[in-house]
From Swiss-Prot:
This is tRNA-specific 2-thiouridylase MnmA. ATP binds at G12, M13, S14, G15, G16, V17, D18, S19, M38, G127. Belongs to the MnmA/TRMU family. It comes from Streptococcus uberis (strain ATCC BAA-854 / 0140J). HAMAP family: tRNA_thiouridyl_MnmA. It is found in: Cytoplasm. It comes from the Bacteria. Coiled coil: none annotated. Its main location: cytoplasm. Disulfide bonds join C103-C200. Its EC number is 2.8.1.13. The gene is mnmA. One of its GO terms (molecular function) is ATP binding.
Amino acid sequence: MSDNSKIRVVVGMSGGVDSSVTALLLKEQGYDVIGVFMKNWDDTDEFGVCTATEDYKDVAAVADQIGIPYYSVNFEKEYWDRVFEYFLSEYKAGRTPNPDVMCNKEIKFKAFLDYAMTLGADYVATGHYAQVRRDEDGIVHMLRGVDNGKDQTYFLSQLSQEQLQKTMFPLGHLQKSEVREIAERAGLATAKKKDSTGICFIGEKNFKQFLSQYLPAQKGRMMTVDGRDMGEHAGLMYYTIGQRGGLGIGGQHGGDNQPWFVVGKDLSKNILYVGQGFYHESLMSTSLQASVIHFTRDMPSEFTLECTAKFRYRQPDSKVTVYVKGEHAEVVFDEPQRAITPGQAVVFYDAEECLGGGIIDMAFKDGVACQYI
């Protein structure tokens, strides 16, 4: 049996139950474990509600309980430069970004990984619901977590082979309910702590209010695709493709009483397009173009791939054909898809394996670009 005590694992601890159990399991398996709390956002800012101080106290309590050293590291500058600025620039461009994908790529598995190496780490570990498997050639494959409802490979799709080689996901084979049970059995301070939701730097704040502190909103016209004026919108950045609600038009102006949805945007004219019906024809597309295409292992610069894909988190896989050219790809759907949203991640799968992904730039319907930006 191998001696794990000679293998140092640095665990990213958030003060939540998942990362607490991650540290506990590794400690029980005999690894040399160090806990590190990442402070990524200045919660003294009047708009940040990340409760970093409380979270750090929870990390300290759990680390003391399981008997591991712990540190706090400040990544506020890196987070602002690499994640938050990206988040703002995407909204400014009329897109709907996914900051979690960028945070994993740039902070948790880059800045944190680099820091862990200065502590003499052999590996880093996080509480993500995903699995890593090493094949006989030493290549690491990233697989979905066994808890379908919690699988987080969508958010980890930009990780590189180099990053995966140094990563452990001890919760990947567990259900969330089992993780809670382990925490309760061990009497961990975080056993009953509520899971955090939403974007870290917004916390419980009103999203519109938060965004308007950084980007001035430009009101404009809300129109149907056939040119009827439906009133005023509050600013294009507040709306996402396929969104229902928050439009202020209810069932009015329509003969069929179907709900209204955001079906398009025109950034150059500052127009928000709305239409009735969940499957409104303007919401349906047959292909997309993506950039920042990235695979979790080395691939040729040009190739074609038949696989499945997700276009948003918690969505069933759809069959696609991917035509890759360097960092760009065209993704053609077997069946038309609804509300393909520029700025969101498209993530590729081969059965249980997450192959990688990219960021959606444009959607097309039978070769014609959808008016989504």
